[in-house]
């Protein structure tokens, strides 16, 4: 048996055992609940977080279990009726695991590959089902969150109330998206009940953070509610010269004059300071990562400022029609310096030659989505018909400069090296707009739900590149248009089992041109066949899902060596096939658990010479995880205590598309312990202490993607003291 499979078996068994035990425990609890209900007419249930799922894709959840969301259909739809693999990271999971990045937030979701670039606080780069979704798959409140080059919006987990995940091609509703699917980040919204929280944190690498979250009615007379969330952090990291400082503020207001009308304003501003590079030097002789920081602590600042403001409006016209409109304006500016050691000096092998650079990028985007929902019957058929039109306009500007820097001294690799100011060499300006119109009908007959949807998009992109030394200008204009669709069928049994089958497509316009042919790139297209089952155990807060999928992507972009440089070419085709299973529960006995396993086989069907028939780099066949959190009984000796623990398995993978070397498999462990001081005395009610650790055993192995090697992020421990009143 292959080594990686042998190492995987214990965790797979643990995941499957946890899933089986979960079903047995939940079934037993359901039987007890039925007995209690029959005996006294009442039963104990978990508190349900019910929010309006018609706007922004917010989640209705009970503990760890997502029940419904608008992410899968743009209308509030139960997960059991969504004919596609969908899951969620709920607000309770965020509280228990206290993630500090989006990657940590998503680490326990099935099929999500985080850590492919090791420790790197600059970007939230991740993959799903073998496809990169960093640029194409991140949405905010059901609206596209654009990104370009290094201008990728940073996402603060403390500003989220959850994440909805729709896997697979999803252009039928959302337009330009990739083959892997989309991750909808749900912003914290005003609550009708008063909420007050302040928190201080201290952690590894001199990490200091203070944060607050206030919400409730503005006054007792007006139907206006507010929320104000913010934090301030001063922190170093495991890499010298790479801080992780952040200031974040997010105001929100909701006006609800009647039950049929609602307007929510969502805003945010943040400033983040980190490093221009965080990578380790790769020895060209071996191609592997060393322990030497490849950057320059004296020339490695990266400051990113971003802001957004938008609204969600919903108005019920009558018993049949509801109108919604969501819109957002967002801006991002990143100013960074970087210095990178790339090879031994010819005269002194203890020195490493370096190259330095600087860039200034600005991204501005406007997104608006208008939709009309109608619910009506035609005979025995119940319809939820959705018609909409959305528009995205973005402008991206980049100034880039390259220069020289002193060599890195391997005998003192953390010493800063002075770098002279670097002038900008090129200026790139890109303007893009996308207009899409879509129609979807969810048709219900008895236990059957047929979902049929289609969309047509028009995209126009103009790119101007100026060589500032010669003042020469290159202009590329391209226009794309494409139809996307989805059809799916779901059957719901009386006992909570819901098998489904679906077919969906996606398209993604590509900016730039092929330097070999001087022709614009065609859009990247993908299609998926998926079959699965979802099981919501009766009278138990437990959801188990499983899916089989096949995804074909064509006209993908690849880097290919031509002469002494790499250029983008388009002649690729990828195929991803796999299986996923996930289980989530939050039981009345204080136990919450999430477990998942994903098998993914991603191959290059067409691509650069030497890669055809190979596996995509850093795409493991096996990913599995288990996280459990238990709150001890209030009347027992451990009253007030909560403990949690998790394990994340990442199977072996190839380090490049040529498949000449491999990344080893690894298991990373996380842990949590908390204490509620109200167990000592009621006068301490609302005061809680929590300590979270990620990569508990500090495993920091090399991980290589696209031929370049990084290192896993090491152990971090964060203590939090929280007070709610």
What are these regions (language model features)?
Residues 21, 47-194, 198, 506, ...:
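Acidic, small-polar-rich N-terminal luminal/periplasmic segments of exported/outer-membrane proteins
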Residues 309-332, 355-466:
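Face-selective signature of the C-terminal outer-membrane beta-barrel domain
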Residues 254-258, 268, 363, 382-386, ...:
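Structural signature of Gram-negative outer-membrane beta-barrels, strongest in the C-terminal barrel
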Residues 447, 550, 570-656, 700:
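Gram-negative outer-membrane beta-barrel transporters
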Residues 6, 384-385, 529, 617-725:
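Conserved C-terminal beta-signal and adjacent last beta-strands/turns
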Residues 314-316, 320-328, 332-340, 523-586, ...:
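Membrane-embedded beta-barrel scaffold of Gram-negative outer-membrane proteins
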Residues 233-237, 249-316, 329-363, 402-434, ...:
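Acidic/polar loop-and-plug regions of large Gram-negative outer-membrane beta-barrel proteins
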Residues 158-161, 167, 172-251, 257-261, ...:
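Outer-membrane beta-barrel translocator/receptor signature
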């Amino acid at each position: 048996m292959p080594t990686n499979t042998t190492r995987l078996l214990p965790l797979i068994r643990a995941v499957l055992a946890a899933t089986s035990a979960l079903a047995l425990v939940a079934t037993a609890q359901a039987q007890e609940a039925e007995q209690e209900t029959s005996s006294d007419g009442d039963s104990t249930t978990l508190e349900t977080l019910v929010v309006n799922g018609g706007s922004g894709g917010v989640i209705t959840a009970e503990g760890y279990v997502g029940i419904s969301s608008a992410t899968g259909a743009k209308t509030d739809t139960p997960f059991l009726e969504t004919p596609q693999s969908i899951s969620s990271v709920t607000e309770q999971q965020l509280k228990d695991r206290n993630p500090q990045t989006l990657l940590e937030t998503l680490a326990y979701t099935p099929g999500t590959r985080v850590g492919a670039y090791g420790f790197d606080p600059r970007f939230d780069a991740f993959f799903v089902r073998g496809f990169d979704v960093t640029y194409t798959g991140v949405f905010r409140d059901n609206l596209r969150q654009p990104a370009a080059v290094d201008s990728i919006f940073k996402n603060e987990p403390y500003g989220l109330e959850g994440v909805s995940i729709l896997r697979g091609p999803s252009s039928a509703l959302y337009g330009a998206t990739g083959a892997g699917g989309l991750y909808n980040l749900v912003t914290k919204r005003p609550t009708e009940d008063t909420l007050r929280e302040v928190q201080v944190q201290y952690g590894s690498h001199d990490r200091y953070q203070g944060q607050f979250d206030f919400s409730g009615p503005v006054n007792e007379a007006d139907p206006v509610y507010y929320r104000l969330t913010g934090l301030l952090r001063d922190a170093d990291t495991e890499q010298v010269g790479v801080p992780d400082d952040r200031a974040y503020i997010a105001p929100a207001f909701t006006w609800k004059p009647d039950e049929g009308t609602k307007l929510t304003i969502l805003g945010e501003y943040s400033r983040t300071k980190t490093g221009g590079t965080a990578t380790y030097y790769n020895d060209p002789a071996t191609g592997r990562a060393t322990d030497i920081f490849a950057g320059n602590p004296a020339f490695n600042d990266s400051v990113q400022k971003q802001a957004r403001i938008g609204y969600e409006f919903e108005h019920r016209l009558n018993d049949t029609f509801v109108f919604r409109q969501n819109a957002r304006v967002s801006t991002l500016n990143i100013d960074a310096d970087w210095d990178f050691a790339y090879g031994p000096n010819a005269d002194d092998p203890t020195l490493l030659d370096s190259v330095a650079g600087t860039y200034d990028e600005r991204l501005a985007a406007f997104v608006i989505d208008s939709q009309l929902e109608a619910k009506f019957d035609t005979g025995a058929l119940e319809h939820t018909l959705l018609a909409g039109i959305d528009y995205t306009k973005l402008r991206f500007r980049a100034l880039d400069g390259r220069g020289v820097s002193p060599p890195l001294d391997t005998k003192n690799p953390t010493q800063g090296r002075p770098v002279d100011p670097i002038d900008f060499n090129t200026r790139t300006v890109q303007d893009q707009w996308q207009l899409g119109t879509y129609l979807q009908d969810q048709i219900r007959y008895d236990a059957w739900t047929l979902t049929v949807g289609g969309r047509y998009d028009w995209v126009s992109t103009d790119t101007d590149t100026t060589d500032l030394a010669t003042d020469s200008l290159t202009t590329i204009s391209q226009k794309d248009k494409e139809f996307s669709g989805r059809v799916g069928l779901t059957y719901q049994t009386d006992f909570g089992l819901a098998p489904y089958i679906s077919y969906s497509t996606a398209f993604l316009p590509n900016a730039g041109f092929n330097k070999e042919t001087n022709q614009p790139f065609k859009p990247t297209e993908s299609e998926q066949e998926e079959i699965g089952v979802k099981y919501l155990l009766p009278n138990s807060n437990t959801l188990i899902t499983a899916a089989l999928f096949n995804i074909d992507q064509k006209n993908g972009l690849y880097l290919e060596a031509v002469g002494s440089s790499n250029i983008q070419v388009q002649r690729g085709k990828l195929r991803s096939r796999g299986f996923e299973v996930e289980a989530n529960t939050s039981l009345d006995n204080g136990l919450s658990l999430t477990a998942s396993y994903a098998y993914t086989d991603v191959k290059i069907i067409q691509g650069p010479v030497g890669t055809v028939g190979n596996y995509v780099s850093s795409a493991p066949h096996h990913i599995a995880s288990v996280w459990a959190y238990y709150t001890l009984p209030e009347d027992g000796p451990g009253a007030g205590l909560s403990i949690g623990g998790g394990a994340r398995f990442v199977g072996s993978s190839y380090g490049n598309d040529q498949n000449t070397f491999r990344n080893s498999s690894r298991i990373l462990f996380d842990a949590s312990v908390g204490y509620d001081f109200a167990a000592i005395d009621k006068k301490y009610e609302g005061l809680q202490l929590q300590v979270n650790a990620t990569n508990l055993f500090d495993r920091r192995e090399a991980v290589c993607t696209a031929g370049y090697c990084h290192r896993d992020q090491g152990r971090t421990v964060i203590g939090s003291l929280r007070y709610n009143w």
